[in-house]
Every structure is written in C-alpha cells, then in structure tokens.
C-alpha cells in the first residue's frame, strides 16, 4: 500500500523520502535496490525493501523503549515508514566489535579479532570522495560538528552499540560491526536516523559455524554468496520473535 504523500524530497540508493502532512515529518519508502562499493555494483532484489523497512522499524522501537531517541514514528505499511524530519549530519559513524572487512585490509589486525572496547570511526559522508575516514584534526578542520557534538555522538553511538549487541546476542546473532547516521530534529535533539538493517550491520549467525553460511547481511551481496533475501528474512523472523 502506498500512503498519501507530498512531493519527492530526496532519493538515495536504498530509499525515497517524501513530504508528509506536517513539515517536521517525512515519509520514507524503502526500495528493492541493492548496491555495494559506492554503487559500482547494483541489483534489484525483490522483497528487500519490505524486509529492511520492517527490520529497521523493530530495531528503532527497541531503541526507543530503552530511551534512545530516534527519528522513527510509525510503520505505515510494509515498505513505508513515518519519521521525524532531521538535518542529517554528514558523517557515517562506524562501530566495530570484531575485526573484518576494510579494517583488516588497512591494518595488520587479523580478521575475527574481538575489539574491546569497540572501535568507533567517523567517515565523511560523500560518495564522490569515497566516504573518507576522518582523523580528529580533519574533523576539526572541516568544522562539521562542535567538540560537544562530537562527544554526544560518541556517547550515543556506544549506547546504541551496547543495546544492539545485547539484543542480537539474545537472538543468537553476533553484531560484528555497523554504521549509524545521525541528525538533528527541529528542536535540535540528536537522533538516530536512516535505517538499522542487514544493509547497515554485519550480522553472523551463532547457529552456524560455516564462515560463509553464517553471514546474514549485505556481505552476501558484496561477495556474491547468494541467498540475500533468505538471509534478511531470517533476521526479520528473529527480530519479530517468530
């Protein structure tokens, strides 16, 4: 079902954002598009938008119950979500609990190494620049956020990490790493925005020891492992308690 909505405000790789009936709200439609490597790899996967929308809704609801402010307001349909309008901070906050992926390519840290405390990195959100990693000095040079906002972002991200780690662990899932996008609402409150889904989280299945079969996230698409929709569907089943 497509809800009544205003004009298209923005279209990204995985979602479309439309005006809603109030200026401080927007409607988000989750698409079936799958992309990787800054959209150099593309495909359309039937059902992906529905799965990511519903997984994100359940995870936002869990965070809200735990007192974490998010932009989420309501699940309007299987693929549409009503959220607060936010001014997105142009940073990707990446938290790593286990070393894998680019961290192992860029450092001598062995894949599978548990990271305690979790590693928190900030990346400048710009596809044209390849979303570069920002040092503290470069962050100050760009003037994207104040020192106080930097502290608030780290505190919020680490709180989200602890909640998601515990929640996924209760579902026999390991949260390897994930990215967060944050924004400020009309009152200036820092909120978790965008989505939290297998597109943005690496999730490994504790119930499966096979190094490929245990992958239940976007790496199945990145690495041509197949079974992307089945993996996302398994995440939704567990998140919903089915």
Swiss-Prot record:
**Which Gene Ontology BP annotations are present?**
'de novo' IMP biosynthetic process; cobalamin biosynthetic process
Keywords from UniProt, A to Z, are: ATP-binding, Ligase, Nucleotide-binding, Purine biosynthesis
Q: Where are the transmembrane segments?
A: none
InterPro entries membership: SAICAR_synt/ADE2_N (IPR028923), SAICAR_synt_PurC (IPR033934), SAICAR_synth (IPR001636), SAICAR_synthetase (IPR050089), SAICAR_synthetase_CS (IPR018236)
Recorded hits in SUPFAM superfamilies, A to Z, give: SAICAR synthase-like
Q: Which organism is it from?
A: Prochlorococcus marinus (strain MIT 9313)
Q: Pfam families this protein is in?
A: SAICAR_synt (PF01259)
This protein's pathway:
Purine metabolism; IMP biosynthesis via de novo pathway; 5-amino-1-(5-phospho-D-ribosyl)imidazole-4-carboxamide from 5-amino-1-(5-phospho-D-ribosyl)imidazole-4-carboxylate: step 1/2
The organism's taxonomic lineage, starting at the top: Bacteria, Bacillati, Cyanobacteriota, Cyanophyceae, Synechococcales
What's the protein called, per UniProt?
A: Phosphoribosylaminoimidazole-succinocarboxamide synthase
